[in-house]
A protein has these predicted regions:
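Intrinsically disordered, low-complexity terminal regions enriched in Ser/Thr/Pro/Gly
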Residues: 426-751
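Residues within mature, well-folded domains
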Residues: 175-176, 212-216, 237-491, 498-514
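Canonical positions in the second alpha-helix
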Residues: 59, 102-103, 153-154, 190-192, ...
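Short coil/linker segments at helix-helix boundaries
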Residues: 35-51, 75-109, 119-153, 170, ...
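Residue-level recognition of tetratricopeptide repeat
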Residues: 66, 110, 161, 198-199, ...
Length: 751
């Protein structure tokens, strides 16, 4: 058989000086082992490696106590295992373990024997039988624990043995149960007093382990030490960013994106692992194919769109993701990677790292409410409630074969066995058997425990025999809907403190030569304010933030401002503090969200859709209707020098005229157009009103000659003859060539 040049070179040092027992491994011996490992790593011909193995075995028979020979045989067997499959690979890994054990018996103070044994234990793995592998983990006999013990011993006999310390740290971080994190940390801290203390891979490993045990300050110090000597170390920048995120440090964002841009392949693996649960497949595919700048653009757009939609500061959602990731890794990691599913477990995440609670937590954070029910004969179970603007989400989890593996199921009834769920349809027959009686008792206990989450559980408890089937179907549909939404979206609602009632108004009006504007107006009742006493009266700080997002998800405007209103007197509970913020926006259709906070609490509006008319061009445009009253002192000066008024409460006394302002664009100078204005009752009520759209309480029609550019129209409406109630103020503009635009504003008339 043809020999590789590398093997010819290897023959030169097959016979070596016999090591002296009890003496530490010399630098020359370590270098010799590393050269041997490097040389066989490039060989892919298993036959050539087996020939070398035969030669080494022959030498070992003549010199059985030569630890160097056994180390070579061990690393050679590992390489043969890598090039083999199935049982043959396992035999090679088993041979490697035997050779390394022999080496440790001959030279227990040499680190390489223990180091190699750690790799052999990892390669051998755990039992293929889930029950057996579970017991191995519980008893600390699993592959990760065995390998961690071996790596720990390599660091114990040589505290400065960098390779062993790095593998010990990596293995401890991978362990899902009985993690040797304390052993790894102690070994790494001992290494800080050795000549290897400043080895980059050692500092990186320690930074990770310090963070994993919660020592964020120590993690940051160690990683900063590494970065001070090598600021270009991409992995160090990535790990420092993760630590800084958990500390709430604003520097984390730049570090994280900077490391992502650098494009180091080892760091990219970490980035992808961190992001793959949330990023859609389409973005992941682009991520994999992109260069550094494009990767940053893709990921930044993903996270910032979430910041803007939920009204957080830019970068906040990314930091929250890493806080969630840290929590999930601590609390919801799977003990076993092997997962089998029952017929009632319809959702299958494809995850082997976290259970289904971890998936939901990563996407939506901590639940608003969490409920468990424990009783003999009932599987471990949890239900999580998330209160959301678009509708509450309830998730049910049950752990059957593995108490650490909670699965997401469609219905609370799926906590029971599949057969028991089917038997619930015949309550009379169930009550006649001990098993049936136990199932009914468990069902009642489960339902009572979930009553705080949703009214349907109280209804299920109160329904008569034979009437539960429809409610059970409805309850299951709620769970199916929650799974469909919860496993494909993510959320982080803005926390604005205690909820307060605030009137807000979003009016796309106020265009000038520089473009269109959105008027964000608010009216806060005095009871929702907490005044600060200042010289000369009282101060009322109000924080207002919001975002304007187009239909493709791109942010066109965002704002976050705090204004302090001063008043000589305290604002009484029945009165309002009013304010306005103009926001520059382009023409188009957008969704808008606004959050408002006072010292007493806050509120977040639902997503509202606005249409901003183009202030220039040939398209006939009509702005939103600015509607107000002099009694509500909220006006601004238009470019024409007139006053336009807003009233966020939308409530008007009959004695106060309604002040209307709107803008018409898209016509040439001198063109005529028709305006029809109606104040009518909204549809609803009697059949006549529903058919014909309600009664018109006030109508006004007039013609206008357009001045070119923007025509600013103001009218004062007398509502003194209107009866109290809700009305719709509608304005319709029609050009001579038949084009027509329409806007509506709701208002309420009171005595």
């Amino acid at each position: 058989m043809r020999q590789f040049p590398t093997l010819i070179a290897l023959q030169v040092f097959l016979v070596c000086a016999r090591p002296v027992p009890g003496i530490g491994q010399s630098p020359a011996q370590r270098a010799e082992i590393e050269r041997f490992r490097d040389s066989i790593a490039v060989i892919t011909d298993a036959g050539a490696l087996r020939n070398l193995e035969t030669d080494l075995i022959a030498q070992a028979r003549q010199d059985r106590s030569n630890a160097m020979l056994h180390l070579r045989l061990g690393f050679l067997a590992l390489r043969l295992g890598e090039l083999s499959d199935g049982d043959q690979a396992r035999r090679h890994f088993d041979d490697a373990g035997s050779e390394f054990e022999w080496a440790t018996q001959e030279q227990p103070n040499w680190p390489y024997g223990w180091y190699g044994l750690g790799f052999a234990e990892l390669a051998l793995g755990d039992s293929e039988i889930p029950l057996v592998s579970g017991f191995q983990m519980m008893l600390g006999k699993d592959a990760l624990t065995r390998s961690a013990n071996a790596f720990a011993r390599s660091a114990e006999v040589d505290p400065g043995f960098v390779a062993g310390l790095v593998e010990l740290s990596s293995t401890a971080l991978r362990q899902r149960i009985n993690a040797r994190m304390d052993v790894a940390l102690a070994a790494l801290r001992r290494a800080s007093r050795t000549p290897s203390a400043n080895a980059p891979e050692l500092l990186l490993a320690r930074g990770r382990v310090e963070r994993a045990v919660g020592s964020l300050d120590s993690s940051a110090v160690v990683l900063q030490k590494l970065l001070s000597t090598d600021s270009t170390n991409v992995l160090a920048r990535y790990e420092m960013a993760r630590t800084r995120f958990l500390e709430g440090d604003s520097e984390a964002l730049g570090l994280w994106y900077g490391a992502l841009s650098a494009g180091d392949s080892s760091a990219l693996d970490h980035y992808r692992e961190d992001l793959e649960i949330l990023l859609p497949d389409s973005i992941l595919q682009q991520f994999d194919a992109a260069n550094g700048a494009r990767r940053v653009e893709l990921v930044r757009q993903f996270w910032e769109s979430r910041d803007d939609d939920e009204l957080h500061a830019r970068g906040a959602r990314l930091a929250e993701h890493y806080r969630r990731l840290d929590y999930v890794r601590r609390h919801y990691r799977l003990v076993s990677e092997r997962r089998r599913y029952g017929i009632e477990e319809r959702y299958r995440s494809g995850q082997s790292e976290y259970d289904d609670r971890g998936i939901i937590y990563l996407r939506h954070g901590a639940p608003d409410e969490r409920v468990r029910y424990s009783a003999p004969g009932i599987e471990p179970n949890e239900s999580w409630l998330y209160r959301r603007e678009s509708g509450d989400l309830i998730f049910h989890f049950v752990a059957r074969e593995d108490v650490q593996d909670f699965r997401l199921v469609e219905s609370l009834f799926d906590v029971l066995s599949f057969a028991d769920v089917l038997s619930l349809n015949d309550t009379e027959e169930m009550g006649a058997t001990p098993r049936g009686a136990a199932v009914m008792q468990h069902t009642e206990g489960l339902l009572r425990s979930r009553e705080p989450l949703h009214p349907i559980y109280s209804r299920l408890l109160g329904v008569g025999r034979g009437g539960a089937s429809g409610l059970m179907t409805e309850e299951r549909r709620l769970g199916q809907n929650a799974i469909a939404i919860g496993t494909t979206t993510d959320s982080w609602p803005l926390d604005v403190g205690e909820p307060i009632e605030v009137n807000t108004s979003l009016v796309a009006v106020g265009a000038d030569s520089t473009g269109a504007q959105l008027q964000v107006a608010f009216a806060i009742p005095g009871e929702a304010l907490a005044p600060r006493e200042v010289e000369g009266g009282f101060a009322y700080p109000v924080r207002l933030r919001g975002s304007v997002i187009d239909l493709d998800g791109r942010t066109v405007a965002r704002f976050d401002t705090t204004r302090v209103f001063r008043n000589r007197e305290r604002i009484e509970p029945q009165r309002h503090l009013v304010g306005r913020l103009p926001v520059r926006v382009p023409a188009g259709t957008f969704t808008v969200r606004v959050a408002l906070e006072t010292d007493r609490g806050g509120m977040v509006t639902a997503r509202d859709t606005i249409h901003v008319a183009p202030p220039v061009g040939n398209e006939l445009g009509l702005s939103d209707l600015a509607v107000g009253a002099r009694a509500v002192r909220l006006a601004w000066e238009t470019p024409a020098g007139d006053s336009a008024w807003l009233n966020p409460t939308r409530t008007y006394r009959r004695t106060d005229p309604v002040l209307l302002y709107f803008e018409v664009s898209g016509l040439e100078q001198g063109e005529e157009y028709e305006v029809r204005l109606e104040l009518r009752r909204p549809r609803g009520g009697s059949i006549f009103r529903r058919l014909f759209g309600g009664g018109v309480a006030l109508r006004m029609e007039f013609d206008q000659v357009h001045p070119g550019g923007i025509d600013r129209v103001s009218r004062e409406l007398d509502i003194g003859r209107l009866s109290s109630g809700d009305y719709s103020l509608e304005v319709r503009v029609k050009s001579d060539d038949g084009r027509e635009v329409f806007r509506r504003q709701l208002l309420r008339v009171v005595e």
